[in-house]
Amino acid sequence: PIFHNFVLADEINRAPPKVQSALLESMQEKQVSIHGETFQLEKPFLVLATQNPIENEGTYKLPEAQIDRFALKILIDYPTKDQEIEIIEKNTSNLQIKVNPIVELKQILEMQKFNEKIYADTIILKYVASLIDATRNPKKYELDLENIIEYGASPRASIWLIKAAKANAMINGRGYVIPEDVKQVIHEVLRHRLILTFEAEAEEVNSDKVIDIILEKIPSP
């Protein structure tokens, strides 16, 4: 099932560590090794993984280094009332659900290439570098987070924050990144990359709150 352009790993934390490792390695290397033979994965190769935040029985914790390979972590809340009604209708009737393609593989590759051409000024790069550095060295920025953050964001976070900001600029019809693009995607990029302390958990401080504090402190260009 890994040899597809789009792979859905449903409840990835229920997969044994060996399976998790194999999937995440394929995400990083864009290839799979079977019995000593290496197979290249076709482009684009996109992985969407889900986790159940409530049920922990029978699950396996993903190592932080492997979680870091995911570009974004998006939180999905309960559906709205209208969405709930639509879900009920589609699942309690003889209605045939048909899914129509909305984009071709070629278009995805073209968008990925176009995204690389979006301009990010040095000022934006420095802003992103400061935001990430603040997660590692909060004291340098007069942030009282040393007892809250155990491990800050990795260099991969900086890369994906710029990539996501470029994508946000593209979606909004701009060929250049502005600080607002960074702010609009930073929670999705960083929330799974910040490792917090037990003290943070005791004080009910989550990654999103830490990101908010850093955004308020670091001056926006």
Predicted segment positions?
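The start of beta-strands in P-loop NTPase/AAA+ ATPase cores
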Residues: 5-6, 192
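Conserved C-terminal "switch" segment of AAA+ ATPases
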Residues: 73-145, 171-175, 179, 200-202, ...
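Walker B catalytic acidic pair
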Residues: 4, 10-11, 22
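P-loop NTPase nucleotide-binding/switch module
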Residues: 1-4, 37-39
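C-terminal engagement/docking regions of AAA+ P-loop ATPases
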Residues: 139-221
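Canonical AAA+ ATPase core
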Residues: 11-19, 27-105, 109-118, 166-168
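Residue-level signature of catalytic and energy-coupling elements of molecular machines
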Residues: 23, 70, 128, 165, ...
